[in-house]
């Protein structure tokens, strides 16, 4: 136990020293064209069309994990798009607004962010659903574009 504590202490000390020695100019930076709140809103404006093809340009292709309200997870954009298209077919209109609490955190070729999003969706039968949900996303710069490589959408169980 004593040896484990020493190893842990040494690791902690190395982290502190390394962090303190980091040049301020070497801090986390993203390119000037990193995602901002307007970019986030552009993504949700695309979702407001109820056609996932209109937001495909914002998502990385390949094996990436996306968590939506249901089902448990999607393992690729293709899988996500196929299922979401069926769900969205039940609606005639939608409006999504990224709230002022949106935060983006640059980390080199990645940017991670969080926001709450206000939603108003009208079913084909006229019923209106209104509420807010949580949105967490990770962007990666690929081919000069910021693409979502991981996303999590959830609703509180209130």
Segments predicted by a language model, with ranges:
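Bacterial N-terminal signal peptides
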Residues: 8-17
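Short beta-strand edge/turn micro-motifs at domain boundaries
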Residues: 132-157
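Beta-strand elements of well-folded, non-transmembrane domains
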Residues: 119-123, 139
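A solvent-exposed, acidic/Ser-Thr-rich amphipathic alpha-helical stretch
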Residues: 34, 52-107, 129-130
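Bacterial N-terminal signal peptides that target proteins for export
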Residues: 1-8
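A short hydrophobic beta-strand element
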Residues: 108-119
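Short, low-complexity N-terminal intrinsically disordered segments enriched in polar/charged residues
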Residues: 20-61
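Hydrophobic pocket/interface hotspot
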Residues: 43, 55-56, 63, 80, ...
């Amino acid at each position: 136990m004593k040896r484990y504590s020493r190893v842990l202490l040494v690791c902690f000390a190395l982290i502190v020293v390394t962090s303190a020695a980091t040049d301020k100019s070497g801090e986390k930076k993203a390119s000037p064209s990193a995602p901002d709140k307007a970019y986030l809103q552009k993504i949700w404006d695309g979702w407001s069309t109820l056609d996932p093809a209109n937001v495909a340009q914002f998502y990385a292709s390949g094996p990436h994990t996306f968590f939506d309200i249901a089902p448990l997870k999607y393992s690729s954009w293709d899988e996500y798009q196929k299922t979401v298209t069926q769900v969205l077919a039940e609606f005639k209109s939608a409006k999504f607004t990224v709230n002022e609490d949106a935060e983006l955190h640059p980390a080199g070729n990645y940017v991670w962010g969080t926001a709450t999003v206000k939603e108003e969706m009208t079913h084909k039968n006229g019923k209106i659903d209104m509420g807010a949900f949580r949105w967490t996303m990770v962007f990666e710069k690929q081919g000069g574009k910021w693409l979502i490589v991981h996303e999590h959408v959830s609703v509180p169980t209130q």
